């Protein structure tokens, strides 16, 4: 055995094949065996005689024959051979074998294990010399026979064989030290063949050694082992030091180095080396070892640590010693053989190992290299001598010396300005001024560079990427200079793709899209600016720092694969848990779907009683008879049945047995019985009778030592790692569950009270048995999807169920051939049509019409009836249960009022959109919940968890409603969503946040000062936003307004989802497993439940937010305080009847107003025709709508909200009114047009026509080119208004004329001929269409139409003087609030014009005067004053003046009372007082109009209070809506037959508005009439009657509250009435004294006259709706009537009328707009409803019914009939009180009092106030009135409705902020 000098060295030794004989004088043979028994002397013998005797020494020497001494023999022989036998060394340095050599092949037996390791290590190393023949040598031919049997040698790598060599060998400076076994492993079959030379001798390298004489004198031990010290303890580590015989641990680390690149060494080198070897050997001492030089680094094994830390190499490139052994047995495959060029290699027939493939190259003839080199050197030397330059210097081969780069240097830009620079070089060199790029910006744009320098993108060098193979590889060796004279045969390279190579693009890079190619994207800008803030946020721990990801090196899970984790990962939890067996065996009747258990048809009653069967009466049997019935105990029967079953089981051989085989086995009279109470009212899936369920006990082990699952009375224990429920089990927790193919549901065992027992009732009698246990079943986790109504699955089930029924009928048939009747099937399936049944029957049977089987369906002879197993497979019991669940839920929805279309199952692709739109009731249907749950379990979506589908309704269950996986679109109601553009301009707008405040916020958030100083403004803002968002998410943070949405990542969203699921799961477990006896008081129990939920959420918040319990309790107390405060405020304004609304309001307002992305759910209670209530839920997601709703709900009262809800109908009424107004305008316009037509067109001046139009203009009227439709040259210019002369269609001549005008004949571009094609111009086709269209129009002149009735103006002489200046008919009534505001604003303007008032014009600037707002708490200025005026905040002068005084007080406080600014403010106040005094009368009237309670008329105040009572109290009674309006005759036809005098609240309000009630008694009579009518029609026990009684009670109660005030008003009214009567009597005595009703001569109605009636005139108001007085007039009634009939309704002709109108009162003038505003009459009606007290505003009406009569005349009988029918008068209380009326005051605005009476007067209805009566100067004819009535209903009704609509529209406007009224509550 050979000992290498070091373990990794490749030192070579020259072996000798001669060994000297032992020298007898040396003391015997040198034996290593002596080492085993003591020290050895210099001769190699044991020292001393004391240890062993001679006999033992002889035995030891005999052991040497076993080969222990052969090591020394080999070593010494090696050196001697070099000295004595140098001539035997052949050309290549190896030793020739001798014929007399002895074979010592058994020397390896001593250290066999070591040699094996050694051979593997040496085989993995490469020799120093790179010879192609290296692998062809064999080092040990003696062992070849044995080793070849054990391990067949692999095929050799390709390489040329040198024929001129006699023996094989390998040449090198040093011979590689390799063992025999290693060389064999490296040797192929060809090498083995070559190893036997021509003469049949073994010519292997070691053969010579073995055949040499081994009896030579051995050297001394000290020569062999320099560390040996005689007489001392042997130091084996030094003797056999490291590397001497140490096995190599990393034996195969470098096996991947291929040997194919070794180059053959030239002959001359070989010869030189031979000589040097011989010289060295001769000079060496025999025992001087020739150690190898230190090996180069690439040949050394790497350190263990480096190897461990290095990146993992591919499994294929890394091989171990074990794999080597396996691979050696297989034929080797060249790596390149099966690469991309495999096809070509297959075509060329290249073998797998690639041997012999040479590309067709030929080796060159070996020429002595020195000769070549000499020739080259001589040439170069000659050149050097001639030039005097060293051409072979290293500098000459640098790139810098090879290129003429100096020529490309631009010394002066002017020189190259005209030249075009090379684009590639120009882009790398940077900007140079040229004609194309005059400046750097233009250059950057041209190059496509981004202008920003701080772009956060990967940095790239401007220079091309270095190719490492070109720089560092020996690529020049692979250049083929001559294919016929190759220095070596090239091997095909192996294609390797380096993922680190930047030239390779192995995947599509993830680049952010840029908006434009030239401008940097917004994202990049954001990233660059937010980089610093991100670093800071990472430091403060708000966001996690993102790890630097290297895209080219994906992270490896487990580089060393130490743990095999991937084999231990738990399986993803699917739908059906794989915990234990889940084979459910139903009873035989259930599997066969037998009738009573699986009904074929269920009617509505059965469906409503689904799984809740009522006790039915028996028609026969013992229980059908009355009388006492005995109750039988079942104890004996149970034991008897158990014994029978046990005997049956024993008889069948023991083991498990299935007993549920017949319907009788399914009785509850025997066996064990448990009760299960389902917590869900209507579970999504329920089992039918006879279906089986397993009880499973899920147990999660504790970590570490687990005691095991606790024993349970029922069920099998299943150990689960992942939870089969939505929440996970805690370690050590056991949860029992029902599990079957339909659902899995947790169950909770409860002890049955001892007092409870079970009664079983059959036809025969009653039976009693004990109950032991009861389970509460939690919420189901569906495993089976319920089909949707009319879905494909549902229809398929119906079809299959019918088919199965038919098959079973055939099986039951005893006839041959089998036959059944259609009637049997129809009886079972009454809902199926006969055609559908026939369709199923035709598949398997034929209908026989004659013969024995007539009217029977007979089974087809060729049809095979399915077997029982096949029938069972067609329809499973689970499918039936799902179908029953679907139809039961469908019935429930139908009962709730949902139509069939509302709960169709959606298509899969539109499902998520569909989920958002369907109603909540439908969303909870089982087909939706089961589909959602199953999809969520498959990971397709998430569940809403809390919401409408929660079966408990109190947050203790899961809501199975789909929401998307990603945190977009809809989320939980509690999670805020970002809504765009809602913070712009508000104080939450981050752009308005100053830097100082932002930094202050950061300090509050705990950011260090030094970090804040480093940030720029927008980085500070970014940190504020991020930290605010983070705190808002966790529920903290006072500055939540700066939070921006809930931009959760998907991972965060999933985490929150899991947490919420776990919370509800734990809560459900806690509640359902609780053994507390719950109180019957539902309120307290629900409060406790909410406490549980709140505790759970508090704990969760404490964990999430790191808040202490004291902080949480403080926050909760604060919330409760605010809630209490809000409730107290609400209680002040709302009545007791509104309390049910508070919860709604609270739930609405509890939504965080600053949070975005809210979802508002409004639950509305409706009542159907039968009086049954049902609830519907509306979901609102628009933030603007939510805000408006919340604001109205919190600030407005019920009356307002009711009107607000009814706005749609009122809006429609307004539209009708608007339509009438527009029709009136059109009528007037038409008349004006007709007048213009009569005048005729003006004469045209003849002008020269241009031959060709200059411009390419096209007329829109006639289509001609060269002019526009407004041009007078257009032939149709004057025809637009005038009717055409032809009465009907155009003649042909006219059409031709039209064509000439439309198309110019000389326009050659209209038609083009291109080859065989004719191209028609677009203009030609358009003009042809125009001609065709115009020719089809039929035109009739106005003169030929039937004449319309025209209103004739009065022609009487005595009326001529009544002509007055023209005024518009539609005089706009002005809101008194607007008038007041305009007066106040004019006063403000006057004050602004005062000198030196500038400091008071705008608010004080806090930056300029820093301490102002600390001193002044209520600042005020003229600008704020003006804004308040425009907002209608001042209904009276006092409030306005109070705010103005505040300016003076503030100035005195801050500047001092004597300061000049205070004096200026005082002058402003003085001016204001002066102006207010000037307009005192007008302002007083306006204030009264605004606030009726300020009115002098007691009747108005009395009516005002009564109306308040009706609207705010009586109408607010819950469910009082049937009494709000008159009963609809369409819906209740017989009502008016039963009820003679109907009454309702709306009618009462109308009576109030007409001031019909002067006392409470008359008011209460009508209120009591409502109750009396209800009793009469509905009965005293009706719910309606109870509601009516409640209305009456509320009325009496409220009247009692106002008793004192109403009593005083009644007295005042009575006094006024008496005074008026007295005055009337006095006036009747003196007929010449003009009274209010004395007919006045026409000349009294002078323009300057202003007539007014005292307020006491109202006492004449008639109670009998007959308020029209017959007052004689100068104008006869007959004449007026005639005028009315002849009128044409033309309102523009009023100036021609002869009836002069009397002047209105002062108030009327005040409320009318100025003449300048009359022009805005088109918009007038929009504001007509602004004033609920606008009855006093007696301008002309905007509706047709408001058109007045010519003068005062009695009402026509037709109108009176209408009035009687409508229950109201046609006039609308045309009472004028001087200074009366006006708007409701601000304080009463919310009450929304609707005064129908305060409307425009009807001029036809002449009440006591004659001063305003005759206003219109014309009449509406009866015909027109009839026409209008047909179009818009009776005029009276439209007016009344209009008045209410106007009020409500005003209210609505006030909410929206568009009204003139005050909207700031």
From Swiss-Prot:
User: Which cellular components does GO assign to this protein?
Assistant: MLL1 complex; transcription factor TFIID complex
EC numbers on record: 2.3.1.48, 2.7.11.1
Any idea where this protein resides?
Nucleus
Q: Tell me yes or no: is Acetylation among this UniProt entry's keywords.
A: yes
| One GO term of the biological process aspect | positive regulation of transcription by RNA polymerase II
UniProt feature, compositional bias: Acidic residues: 1683-1697, 1715-1730, 1820-1829
Which parts of this chain are annotated as the region Histone acetyltransferase (HAT)? 512-971
- Residue ranges under compositional bias (Pro residues)? 151-160, 1633-1642
**What is the official name of this protein in its record?**
Transcription initiation factor TFIID subunit 1
Q: Which organism is it from?
A: Mesocricetus auratus (Golden hamster)
Q: What is the lineage of its organism?
A: Eukaryota, Metazoa, Chordata, Craniata, Vertebrata
Q: Which gene encodes it?
A: TAF1
């Amino acid at each position: 055995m050979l000992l290498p000098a070091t373990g990794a060295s490749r030192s070579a030794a020259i072996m000798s094949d001669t060994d000297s004989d032992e020298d007898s004088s040396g003391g015997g043979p040198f034996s290593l065996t002596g080492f085993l028994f003591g020290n050895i002397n210099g001769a190699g013998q044991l020292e001393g005689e004391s240890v062993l005797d001679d006999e033992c020494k002889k035995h030891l020497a005999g052991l040497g024959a076993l080969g222990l001494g052969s090591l020394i023999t080999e070593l010494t022989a090696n050196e001697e051979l070099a000295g004595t036998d140098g001539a035997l060394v052949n050309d290549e340095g190896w030793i020739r074998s001798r014929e007399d050599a002895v074979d010592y092949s058994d020397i390896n037996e001593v250290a066999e294990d070591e040699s094996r390791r050694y051979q593997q290590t040496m085989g993995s190393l490469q020799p120093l010399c790179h010879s192609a023949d290296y692998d062809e040598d064999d080092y040990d031919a003696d062992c070849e026979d044995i080793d070849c049997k054990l391990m067949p040698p692999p095929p050799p790598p390709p390489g040329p064989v040198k024929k001129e060599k006699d023996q094989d060998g390998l040449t090198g400076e040093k011979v590689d030290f390799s063992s025999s076994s290693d060389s064999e492993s490296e040797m192929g079959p060809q090498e083995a063949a070559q190893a036997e030379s021509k003469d049949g001798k073994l010519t292997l390298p070691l053969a010579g050694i073995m055949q040499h004489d081994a009896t030579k004198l051995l050297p001394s031990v000290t020569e062999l082992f320099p560390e040996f010290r005689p007489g001392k303890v042997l130091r084996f580590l030094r003797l056999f030091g490291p590397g001497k015989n140490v096995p190599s641990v990393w034996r195969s680390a470098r096996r991947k180095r291929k040997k194919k690149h070794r180059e053959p060494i030239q002959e001359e080198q070989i010869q030189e080396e031979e000589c040097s070897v011989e010289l060295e050997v001769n000079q060496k001492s025999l025992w001087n070892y020739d150690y190898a030089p230190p090996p180069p680094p690439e040949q050394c094994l790497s350190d263990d640590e480096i190897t461990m830390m290095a990146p993992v190499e591919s499994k294929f490139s890394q091989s171990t010693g074990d794999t080597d052994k396996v691979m050696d047995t297989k034929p080797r495959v060249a790596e390149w053989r099966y690469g991309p060029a495999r096809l070509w290699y297959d075509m060329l027939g290249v073998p797998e190992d690639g041997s012999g493939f040479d590309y067709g190259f030929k080796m060159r003839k070996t020429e002595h290299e020195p000769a070549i080199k000499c020739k080259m050197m001589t040439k170069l030397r000659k050149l050097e001598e001639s030039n005097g330059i060293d051409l072979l210097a290293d500098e000459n081969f640098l790139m810098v010396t090879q290129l003429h780069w100096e020529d490309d240097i631009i010394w002066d830009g002017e020189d190259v300005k005209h030249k075009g620079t090379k684009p590639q070089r120009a882009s790398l060199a940077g900007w140079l001024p040229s004609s194309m790029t005059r400046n750097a910006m233009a250059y950057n744009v041209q190059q496509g560079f981004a202008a920003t320098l701080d772009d956060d993108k990967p940095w790239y060098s401007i220079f091309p990427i270095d190719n490492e193979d070109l720089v560092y590889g020996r690529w020049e060796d692979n250049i083929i200079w001559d294919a016929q004279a190759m220095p070596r045969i090239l091997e095909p390279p192996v294609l390797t793709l380096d993922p680190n190579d930047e030239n390779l693009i192995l995947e599509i890079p993830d680049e952010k899209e840029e908006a434009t190619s030239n401008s940097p994207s917004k994202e990049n800008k954001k990233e660059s600016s937010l980089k610093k803030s991100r670093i800071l946020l990472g430091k403060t721990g708000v966001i996690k720092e993102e790890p630097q990801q290297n895209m080219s090196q994906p992270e490896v899970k487990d580089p060393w694969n130490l743990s095999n984790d991937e084999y231990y990962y738990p399986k993803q939890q699917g739908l059906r848990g794989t915990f234990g067996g889940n084979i459910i065996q139903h009873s035989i009747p259930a599997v066969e779907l037998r009738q009573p258990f699986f009904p074929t048809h269920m009617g509505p009653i059965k469906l409503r009683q689904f799984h809740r069967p009522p006790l039915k009466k028996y028609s026969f049997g013992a229980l059908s008879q009355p009388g006492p019935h005995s109750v039988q105990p079942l104890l004996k029967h149970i034991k008897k049945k158990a014994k029978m079953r046990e005997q049956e089981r024993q008889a069948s051989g023991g083991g498990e047995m299935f007993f549920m085989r017949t319907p009788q086995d399914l009785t509850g009279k025997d066996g064990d019985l448990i009760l299960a109470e389902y917590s869900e009212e209507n579970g999504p899936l329920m089992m039918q009778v006879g279906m089986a369920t397993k009880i499973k006990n899920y147990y999660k082990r504790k970590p570490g030592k687990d005691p095991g699952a606790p024993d349970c009375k029922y069920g099998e224990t299943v150990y689960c790692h992942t939870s089969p429920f939505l929440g996970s089990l805690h370690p050590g927790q056991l949860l029992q569950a029902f599990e079957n193919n339909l659902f899995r549901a947790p169950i909770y065992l409860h002890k049955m009270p001892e007092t409870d027992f079970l009664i079983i009732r059959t036809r025969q009698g009653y039976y009693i048995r004990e109950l032991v246990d009861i389970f509460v079943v939690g919420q189901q986790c569906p495993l089976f999807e319920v089909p949707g109504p009319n879905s494909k699955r549902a229809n398929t089930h119906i079809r299959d169920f019918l088919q199965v029924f038919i098959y079973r009928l055939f099986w039951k048939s005893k006839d041959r051939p089998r036959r059944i009747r259609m009637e049997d099937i129809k009886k079972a399936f009454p809902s199926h049509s006969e055609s559908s049944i026939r369709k199923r029957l035709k598949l398997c049977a034929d209908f026989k019409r004659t013969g024995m089987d007539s009217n029977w369906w007979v089974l087809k002879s060729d049809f095979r009836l399915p077997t029982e197993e096949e029938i069972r497979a067609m329809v499973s019991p689970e499918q039936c249960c799902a179908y029953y669940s679907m139809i039961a839920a469908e019935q429930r929805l139908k009962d709730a009022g949902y139509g069939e279309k509302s709960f169709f199952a959606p298509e899969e692709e539109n499902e998520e959109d569909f989920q958002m739109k369907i109603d909540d009731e439908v969303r909870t249907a089982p087909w939706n919940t089961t589909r959602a749950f199953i999809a969520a379990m498959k990971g397709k979506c998430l569940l809403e968890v809390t919401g409408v589908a929660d079966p408990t309704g109190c947050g203790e269950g899961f809501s199975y409603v789909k929401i998307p996986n990603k945190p977009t679109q809809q989320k939980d109601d509690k999670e805020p969503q970002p809504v765009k553009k809602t913070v712009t301009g508000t104080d939450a707008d981050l752009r308005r946040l100053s830097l100082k405040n932002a930094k202050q916020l950061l300090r509050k958030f705990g950011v260090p000062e030094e970090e804040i100083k480093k940030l720029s403004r927008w980085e500070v803002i970014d940190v504020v936003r991020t930290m605010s968002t983070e705190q808002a998410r966790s529920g903290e943070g006072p500055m939540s307004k700066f939070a921006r949405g809930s931009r959760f990542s998907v991972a965060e969203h999933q985490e929150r989802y899991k947490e919420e699921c776990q919370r509800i799961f734990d809560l459900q477990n806690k509640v359902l497993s609780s053994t507390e006896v719950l109180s019957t008081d539902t309120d307290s129990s629900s409060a406790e439940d909410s406490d549980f939920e709140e505790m759970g959420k508090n704990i969760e918040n404490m964990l999430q937010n790191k808040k202490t319990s004291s902080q949480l309790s403080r926050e909760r107390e604060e919330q409760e305080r605010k809630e209490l405060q809000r409730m107290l405020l609400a209680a002040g304004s709302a009545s007791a009847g509104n309390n049910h609304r508070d919860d709604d309001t609270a739930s609405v307002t509890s939504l965080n107003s600053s949070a975005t992305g809210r979802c508002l759910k409004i639950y509305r209670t409706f009542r159907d025709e039968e009086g049954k209530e049902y609830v519907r839920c509306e979901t609102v997601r628009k933030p603007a709508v939510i805000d408006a709703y919340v604001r109205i709900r919190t600030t407005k009262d019920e009356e307002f909200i009711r009107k607000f809800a009814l706005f749609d109908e009122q809006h429609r009424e307004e539209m009708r009114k608007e339509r009438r107004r527009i029709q009136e305008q059109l009528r007037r316009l038409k008349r004006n047009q007709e007048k213009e037509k009569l005048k005729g067109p003006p004469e045209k001046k003849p002008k020269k026509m241009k031959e060709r139009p200059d411009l390419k203009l096209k007329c829109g009227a006639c289509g001609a080119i060269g002019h526009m439709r407004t041009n007078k040259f257009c032939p149709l210019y004057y025809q637009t208004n005038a009717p055409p002369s032809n009465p009907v269609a155009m003649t042909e001549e006219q059409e031709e004329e039209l064509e000439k005008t439309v198309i110019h004949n000389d326009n050659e571009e209209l038609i083009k001929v291109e080859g065989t094609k004719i191209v028609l111009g677009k203009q030609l086709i358009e003009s042809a269409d125009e001609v065709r269209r115009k020719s089809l129009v039929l035109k009739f002149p106005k003169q030929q139409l039937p004449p319309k009735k025209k209103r004739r103006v009065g022609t009487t002489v005595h009326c001529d003087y009544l002509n007055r200046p023209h005024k518009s008919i539609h005089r706009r009534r002005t809101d008194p609030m607007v008038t007041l505001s305009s007066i106040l604003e004019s006063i403000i303007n006057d004050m602004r014009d005062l000198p030196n008032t500038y400091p008071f014009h705008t608010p004080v600037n806090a930056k300029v005067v820093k301490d102002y707002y600390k001193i002044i708490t209520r600042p005020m200025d003229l600008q704020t004053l003006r804004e308040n005026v425009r907002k209608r905040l001042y209904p009276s002068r006092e409030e306005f003046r109070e705010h103005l005084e505040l300016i003076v007080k503030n100035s005195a406080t801050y500047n001092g009372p004597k300061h000049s600014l205070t004096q200026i403010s005082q002058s402003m106040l003085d001016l204001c007082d002066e102006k207010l005094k000037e307009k005192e009368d007008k302002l007083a009237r306006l204030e009264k109009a605004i606030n009726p309670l300020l009115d002098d008329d007691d009747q108005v105040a009395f009516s005002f209070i009564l109306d308040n009572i009706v609207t705010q109290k009586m109408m607010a009674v819950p469910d009082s809506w049937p009494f709000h309006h008159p009963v609809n005759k369409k819906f209740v036809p017989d009502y008016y037959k039963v009820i003679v005098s109907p009454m309702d609240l709306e009618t009462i309000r109308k009576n109030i508005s007409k001031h019909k009630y002067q006392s409470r008694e008359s008011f209460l009579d009508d209120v009591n009439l409502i109750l009396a009518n209800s009793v009469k029609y509905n009965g005293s026990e009706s719910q309606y009657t109870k509601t009516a009684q409640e209305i009456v009670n509320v009325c009496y109660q409220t009247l009692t509250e106002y008793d004192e005030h109403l009593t005083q008003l009644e007295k005042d009214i009575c006094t006024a009435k008496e005074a008026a009567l007295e005055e009337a009597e006095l006036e009747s005595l003196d007929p010449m004294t003009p009274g209010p009703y004395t007919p006045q001569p026409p000349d009294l109605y002078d323009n300057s006259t202003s007539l007014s009636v005292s307020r006491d005139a109202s006492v004449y108001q008639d109670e009998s709706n007959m308020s029209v007085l017959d007052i004689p007039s100068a104008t006869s009634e007959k004449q007026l009537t005639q005028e009315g009939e002849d009128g044409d309704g033309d309102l523009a002709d009023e100036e021609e009328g002869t009836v002069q109108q009397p002047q209105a009162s002062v108030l009327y003038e005040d409320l009318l707009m100025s003449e300048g505003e009359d022009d805005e009459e088109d918009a007038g009606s929009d504001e007509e409803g602004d004033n609920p007290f606008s009855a006093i505003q007696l301008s002309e009406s905007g509706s047709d019914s408001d058109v007045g009569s010519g003068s005062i005349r009695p009402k026509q009988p037709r109108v009176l009939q209408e009035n009687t029918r409508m229950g109201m008068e046609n006039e609308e209380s045309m009472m004028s009180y001087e200074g009366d009326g006006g708007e409701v005051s601000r304080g009463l605005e919310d009450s929304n009092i609707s005064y129908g009476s305060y409307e425009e007067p009807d001029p036809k209805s002449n009440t006591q106030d004659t001063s305003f009566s005759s206003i219109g100067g014309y009449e509406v004819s009866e015909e027109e009135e009839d026409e209008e009535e047909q179009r818009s209903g009776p005029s009276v009704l439209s007016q009344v409705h209009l008045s209410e609509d106007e009020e409500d529209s005003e209210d609505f406007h006030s909410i929206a902020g568009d009204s003139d009224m005050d909207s700031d509550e």
